[in-house]
Amino acid sequence: MIFPVTLLAFQWHRRPGGRALSRAAMEVAFRGVRKVLCVAEKNDAAKGIADLLSNGRMRRKEGLSKFNKIYEFDYHLYGQNVTMIMTSVSGHLLAHDFQMQFRKWQSCNPLVLFEAEIEKYCPENFIDIKKTLERETHHCQALVIWTDCDREGENIGFEIIHVCKAVKPNLRVLRARFSEITPHAVRTACENLTEPDQRVSDAVDVRQELDLRIGAAFTRFQTLRLQRIFPEVLAEQLISYGSCQFPTLGFVVERFKAIQAFVPEVFHKIKVTHDHKDGTVEFNWKRYRLFNHTACLVLYQLCMEDPMATVVEVRSKPKSKWRPQALDTVELEKLASRKLRINAKETMRIAEKLYTQGYISYPRTETNIFPKDLNLVALVEQQTVDPHWGAFAQTILERGGPTPRNGSKSDQAHPPIHPTKYTSGLQGDDRRLYEFIVRHFLACCSQDAQGQETTVEIDIAQERFVAHGLIILARNYLDVYPYDHWSDKLLPVYEQGSHFQPSTVEMVDGETSPPQLLTEADLIALMEKHGIGTDATHAEHIETIKARMYVGLTSDKRFLPGHLGMGLVEGYDSMGYEMSKPDLRAELEADLKLICEGKKDKFQVLRQQVQKYKQVFIEAVAKAKKLDEALSQYLGERTEMAQQEEIYPAMPEPVRKCPQCNKDMVLKTKKSGGFYLSCMGFPECRSAVWFPDSVLEASRDNSVCSVCQPPPVYRLKLKFKRGSLPPAMPLEFVGCIGGCDETLKEIFGLRFPRALPRASQPSGHLQASQALNRMDSSQHNLSQPLVNRHTRPSKTVAQALLPPTTAGESNSVTCNCGREAVLLTVRKQGPNQGRHFYKCSNGDCNFFLWADSSHSTGGGTPTSASGPPGSSVGCPSSVGSHMDGFGSLGSDSDGGTPCLCGQPAVTRTVQKDGPNKGRQFHTCAKPREQQCGFFQWVDENVAPGSFAAPAWPGGRGKAQRPEAASKRPRAGSSDAGSTVKKPRKCSLCHQPGHTRTFCPQNR
């Protein structure tokens, strides 16, 4: 279930940078604040921070989420005694996804996903957390964000802000910045609150949206196609794509292919050894090796002719082995993989756990420089109690204190990873990783190992050979850092100019070897070098390509590409797009940094990147057979696919914006046949335009209406059934249903809240109303003038002309005011007692419609009038007297009389006693409960349009009485000025000879 977050709640107007505020400004801002809501990224962090700020005197309460508790405590903040309400989220509170209509894989062509609307919503499993925040916000005057101080943490902070400010827009919002959960760090953060940094959050929004669009489009493309091409192998396989996944896979494939393409070469070299009482010294040839056997053999033979060695040089110099640099995230992942055999994902999971427990500083950092204001002495002192490395820590303090070896990188957010608290209670990999971080920190703060290196160079037949020896003078950091090795290599004493007989002089052969497969540490190093992902996401991308079976691991934990991974990379490479190369993603990562620095606009980056990947996608789909061919080399015979349309559904093209929700409305086909215009916001928005059954074909034209708003409103190519339109109207034409074409408004039953502006139409496009009016004026030459086609159409007729509805295809009943009509029941005794009807909810427009005829199953139109039950049925005001072809009120071409349904009327005879007994009349042929209310005497010559004439402009839709339309005597009267009393007329049909009680319409 999805709970969309109101877009207005996302409007955040603080300054983009996370600047610090002066204490005076903060004291002013906190005046009157009694309760402060504090939100951390995880429950453990919230508990730890609350415990430190309250000195252990916090009060725990249950939140609506059982995993996220609430901790209350009193605190003195900026001159105010306040109650702090500390709670947490569980990572990201909100998620990005496409709108509902795009989420099903078969709902659209994947290309649409590059432009489809995306919404940010709260997943169902986080709703309780969201409700907790909303509930607590009501009672608080300020909000302090305590999420992790990195990009993701900043973005999570803004998600919290959006939720809370939707409840209380004037809520004061501040940001706590810290790198470790220690008493000093959290109190310092409280005393130096800053503003949240919108720019950093924007960078995450851009990355999330691009990952969603690019990943979803390519994943659907690959999966849907390849599952059909290789059904036996990939029928159940998700073949995902990610702009970081593929370059990561590309590194593995590239190394594997380099090994495959490697051609070994034989080389030759001369080796000299000299035995002495302490061992054997090996002298290496200064030429190293030769690939020419003959040349090496000649030199070897020269050496063998006079094998006496002469010592030509003895050098001795100090040698240092550098201690490790301060630890950043990438180095932690690499070293843990190499030294501890813990993979990167598990390393970061454990490191996050140690951080929230307060044992180490924040583990996601690009910094390898300790800040000068960090108290390293206190951190070293904490470790002096340990039985394994405590003595070494004490030695550091006794020798002048810590002197860390710094690197050259800083993210200006967090210090290098270091221990913040001593513990001896950890077990398993938790203990091993904590010990590594402590030992690395102590080694970094110690001294380099010192030694003395001796180099001896000898000459044999003018060929030079060299040997190296080492004596370690001071181990220093090596005493605490067992992960590095440096051993003595003793040499006997050689005097310059002395001679000795080598023990062996031999020519040996060898062969060049290919590079090794990548280890996880190698892969992370390549990702960092080429800007693929961040220190926080390297492990995630590696795990993804393993889970998708794109790569596997050998027995010695090296990456080997699988058949699927190889085929995908080779397939895309054969298209000419090096999607497995890091360039595209590296550009994006660079742009994200520029967004964080305020040097690039988020929307500009989004547009550029979407367009770039969209173009690649279009061409990749066009060349998809190359992907099939590449994979067939690894997966076997493929199934031929004839048409692209067989795999992907056609893209719905937007026709206009929905008047209700402003989303696109697209042309769709009903299951039962026929067409309708549907809102892309379905099911949240159910706006639709149902086309009548007379429409045989409908498609979007590329021309845009210059009148209708909001633009663009595309015209439609329409084809109607023969006989459904007036004879002079073409059955095929291009028309607009945006509201400017009055006749199409009537045909399609369009209802608009207000009249649209009218303007001249571009030439070349025929409007239905124009064709109809030309037909009326040229062929019928009626004495009654046509109603102005610019007149706003009657809501009643718009409703009456709606097509028959089936299950799931309904339009709400709207009165002439544009409001939803109210459903009532006839209470008065009579033939219609108990019958339901619709009426204007405000009583403003005298709208009336029988409920049982609003959804006629017989294909007719519903009974609709502008009067109370039993009154005359009104004609549409915008159609007037030219209704031929749509159910004319006059005689049709073959002499029959159609009713309001457009069907031939039947002739009946009055059976009741009275003056009209035996008189014939025309009425609707349908059963009584479905009749449209049409009535006409057979012996009466009724001019077209005189029956229930159209409403006068401004007359609130009331039907005009025939006698009001003309005061002239009826045709056939011999004396126009006669004063003979007129007979009483029926109040229903306005005909003489009977009353309402005996009217055939009131049966």
UniProtKB/Swiss-Prot annotation:
Cited Pfam families = Topoisom_bac (PF01131), Toprim (PF01751), Zn_ribbon_GRF (PF06839), Zn_ribbon_Top1 (PF01396)
Zinc finger boundaries on the chain: C4-type:
658-685
Source organism superkingdom? Eukaryota
User: Its principal location?
Assistant: mitochondrion
Q: What is its EC number?
A: 5.6.2.1
Q: Can you tell me which residues bind Zn(2+) 2?
A: C899, C901, C924, C932
Biological process terms from the Gene Ontology for this record are:
chromosome separation; DNA topological change; double-strand break repair via homologous recombination; mitochondrial DNA metabolic process; resolution of DNA recombination intermediates
Cofactor dependence is on: Mg(2+)
Bias-annotated ranges (Low complexity): 862-888
Q: Binding of Zn(2+) 1: at which residues?
A: C815, C817, C840, C845
Zinc-finger (GRF-type) residue ranges come to: 815-854, 899-941
Describe the function of this protein: Releases the supercoiling and torsional tension of DNA introduced during the DNA replication and transcription by transiently cleaving and rejoining one strand of the DNA duplex. Introduces a single-strand break via transesterification at a target site in duplex DNA. The scissile phosphodiester is attacked by the catalytic tyrosine of the enzyme, resulting in the formation of a DNA-(5'-phosphotyrosyl)-enzyme intermediate and the expulsion of a 3'-OH DNA strand. The free DNA strand then undergoes passage around the unbroken strand thus removing DNA supercoils.
Protein name stated in the entry: DNA topoisomerase 3-alpha
What is the species listed in this Swiss-Prot or TrEMBL entry?
Answer: Mus musculus
